[in-house]
Amino acid sequence: MPKMKTHRGAKKRIKVTGTGKFVIKHSGKSHILTKKDRKRKNHLKKDAVVTETYKRHMQGLLPYGEGR
């Protein structure tokens, strides 16, 4: 059986923690920021942990746990 391929876009955007969690950046922080309040922009700065619902999908995109 051939090797599974890593999704190259996912490799650039998703990091895998030591415990196996997937960490991504929030979207909506690059432009049109004047209408967003300070609290919202500060929350968008922080990394987001992928929920259990999407964890299986992320494992398919990164079969070898790349992105560390």
Curated annotation (Swiss-Prot):
It comes from the Bacteria. Gene3D superfamilies: 4.10.410.60. One of its GO terms (cellular component) is cytosolic large ribosomal subunit. Keywords: Ribonucleoprotein, Ribosomal protein. GO terms for molecular function: structural constituent of ribosome. InterPro entries: Ribosomal_bL35, Ribosomal_bL35-like, Ribosomal_bL35_CS, Ribosomal_bL35_sf. GO terms for biological process: translation. PANTHER family: 54S RIBOSOMAL PROTEIN BL35M, LARGE RIBOSOMAL SUBUNIT PROTEIN BL35M. Belongs to the bacterial ribosomal protein bL35 family. This is Large ribosomal subunit protein bL35. It comes from Fusobacterium nucleatum subsp. nucleatum (strain ATCC 25586 / DSM 15643 / BCRC 10681 / CIP 101130 / JCM 8532 / KCTC 2640 / LMG 13131 / VPI 4355).
